[in-house]
Amino acid sequence: MKIWLLQASEPMPISNCNDRLWRMGMIAEELKKRNHDIVWFSNTFDHLKKQQLYNKDTIVNVTDNYSIYLIHAMGYKRNISVSRIINHKVIAKKFSRIAKKLDKPDLIYASFPTIDYAEEAIKYGKRNNVPVIIDIRDLWPDIFKHNLSKPLALIASPYINIMNYKTKKIMRQAFAINSISEAMLEWGLKKGNREKSKYDQYFYIGYDSNNRNIVETKEMNSIDKDKFNLSFFATINNQFDYEKIIELAKLLEKDKDIVINICGDGPQFAELKEKVKDVSNIKLLGWKEKEELNYILQNSKLGLAPYKNTFDFQMSVSNKFAEYISYGLPVILFSEGYMEKLLEDNECGIASQDTSKLCDFILDVKNDKQKYEAMSKNAQDLYQENFVAEKIYKNLVDYLEKIKEEVEKWNMH
């Protein structure tokens, strides 16, 4: 099977990108194992680190049957910005031109967002009779209405309306819709005004718990393995409720054994650093590579998921959620919705916006070893049952192979 993958912002298996692979990277690895021909269209701009990996269009051959086509476009500093819009439009248009020169694939698997990339995939699929599967990762453009202030939302409304029109068309014309949760799949079907078919399915974000290399560096001295560590890692941006983290930390200060470790960098790092400078039990550790994160998580007791209680996180299941439970870490969640239900149904954490309630829970599991161990086991069981990357992406590639076979049969008739 010849397949094109479209994903512009995830880590890739290339020499100058040392982060662990996410969803598209793991799908590509499973396809590679089965000797399928893969072209992954991505972006020369590293979305996580906000830096250019290459200064021109570049093809990286991972293996003989697996290539990554990095399309060059200008970078951006903020996730919601005009520069990012331009980046998305440029790589989408360049993809359209590049695609015309290549042998057509059997399938296209395109992440959503970006809207522009997905739109060009749909156009190509229609012109060339290639099935396009759209994989919903985030609820664009609806999230813009919620994340922008009222004046900015009003100014941006013409652009948002255009993007909403494009999104409806993408969801309507896709051969199939995938997503990372059932709720997000329903959102996509509603956008496309379509009935659910057997090909419209959701696959959770899988986390690969194998190959957990650990690097102990001098910096790791800041992690006290004997403390009751709550850990959180992310790009430090406006998706998270830092005020609540600080509020929770102050409530926990009375217990000197509890430490909140925050790993990451981003546009709001300097502001956060200033806010927590006098909070004794919060440690800002900066950006960490995957080996260092492994060390931190293996020496943590709880995983902190301080998402703002917005509709998109209420419908989603995050990378962080899967990673925390893979380590057997009960999760402290700030948002309601889909992840909240998973925690409640499986008794492996708490979801609340009430910091007093969160504080009581943390102190309770810290002081009740039996309760903590039961929750930790429940977290690992939930991971093994629903979030093991090898199982999820094996099933997903089985699904793609089945689509290819069935489409071939239709074309023969």
What residues fall within each predicted segment?
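Nucleotide-activated donor-binding/catalytic signature segment of Leloir-type glycosyltransferases, i.e.
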Residues: 270-295
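Conserved acidic donor-binding segment of nucleotide-sugar-dependent glycosyltransferases
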Residues: 345-356, 364-370
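N-terminal subdomain of nucleotide-sugar transferases
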Residues: 1-60, 176, 247-253, 412-413
